[in-house]
A protein has these predicted regions:
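The AdoMet/dcAdoMet-binding core of the Class I SAM-like
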Residues: 2-8, 56-118
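N-terminal auxiliary segments of SAM/dcSAM-dependent transferases
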Residues: 1-47
Length: 118
């Protein structure tokens, strides 16, 4: 592997890591709460990396967010006004807004600066 090729290595345990070759780093930022990197990868598409851990990947984030949101939305008789605690990347909001009965979504995240990265 060429030394000039950018790689991101994520540590899963003290004994296990996974490395991802980056196509391009789009944004690097440091907020009061976290270090954020938005990068395009070859295997997972665009990734949001927070504090050196992949938070979300374009290729498979829908699996997590659909499973998080859709059961609650299906079970609630009239989901209209929704409060999301966290969810700064916006995928939870996207899933909620698929439901026509929703009239208002409020999202509160500890790190308001992260929206400018995502």
């Amino acid at each position: 592997m060429a030394a000039s090729v950018p790689w991101f290595t994520e540590r899963y345990t003290p004994h296990d890591v996974r490395s991802h070759q980056l196509k391009k780093v789009l944004v690097r930022s440091q907020t009061r709460f976290q270090k954020a990197v938005l990068a395009d990868t070859y295997s997972f598409g665009r990734c949001l990396i927070l504090n050196d851990e992949i938070q979300s990947a374009e290729k498979d984030e829908f699996i997590y967010h659909e499973c998080l949101v859709q059961p609650a939305m299906a079970l609630h008789p009239r989901p209209r006004d929704i409060l999301i605690l966290g969810g700064g990347e916006g995928a939870t909001v996207r899933e909620i807004l698929r439901h026509p009965r929703v009239r208002r979504v409020t999202m509160v995240d500890i790190d308001g600066d992260r929206k400018s990265v995502v």
